[in-house]
Amino acid sequence: MSTPQPPQSPQSPQQPQGPQPPFLLPTQIPEGQAPGVRYRIQGELVPVLHIWLDGQVPVFFEHHVVLWKNPQLTIGIHQMKGAFKRLVAGMPIYMTEARGPGEIAFSRDGAGHVFPIHLQPGQAIEVREHQFLAATGTLDYGFTRQKGIANMLFGSTGFFVDRFAALQYEGVVWLHGYGNVFEKILAPGEQIDVEPGGWIYRDESVRMDPTVYGLKTGIFGGAGQLVFNRFTGPGRVGIQSMYYHLPSSEEGGQQAQSSPFGGLFNN
């Protein structure tokens, strides 16, 4: 008669080997801080960003994203470089600036995910246009025109990418993603293919190239193309779960021409 064996304890599942998938960024932040500001992010469906200014560092933002503010905060114009190019493209030629002390709240008119990106001196990040919510005045702002993959998807002239850089001082930029936002940290040489409407930000160290797959069937021949953006590390890539395809800048230019003020008051 065989001797009974003690029951074996269940083994923990093995962790998958190889590159890790993108991870979900926090959807709510009870309290965060950066030089000159404190902030919190609340809400699930349409989150709200609350920023408290100590009076030393202003924040700048697009004029249509303010939800409420304390009356003592002063509002002014935040000058930007390349105003003429932005005007021609149908983009706003200035942003709004708030100075404290006091509190101000921001929100976009769409469901999504609001999150911060902190930048240390020497760091810079590129962001798809119309996904920037607010930034501290310690950051330098610029923009570039994205071509290549943009030419195939958004018209012959491409679209703009916002650039935020911490030149001398630490700063933070808050972004709005559609759906939820995941982050992938790429090792040097590591790659990930992302649907063109799915990326929201990337470190400047990350290279982005178009990747096109021709789809064919045995009966009908060509069945179209499947296009991705291929990102190559090192660095971070932000991915939003709800695809957002920008209108072409040609359409933006036509909208600007239909207004007597050009792109001055466009989103």
What name fits each language-model region?
Residues 2-267:
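Composition-driven recognition of glycine/serine/threonine/acidic- and proline-rich low-complexity segments
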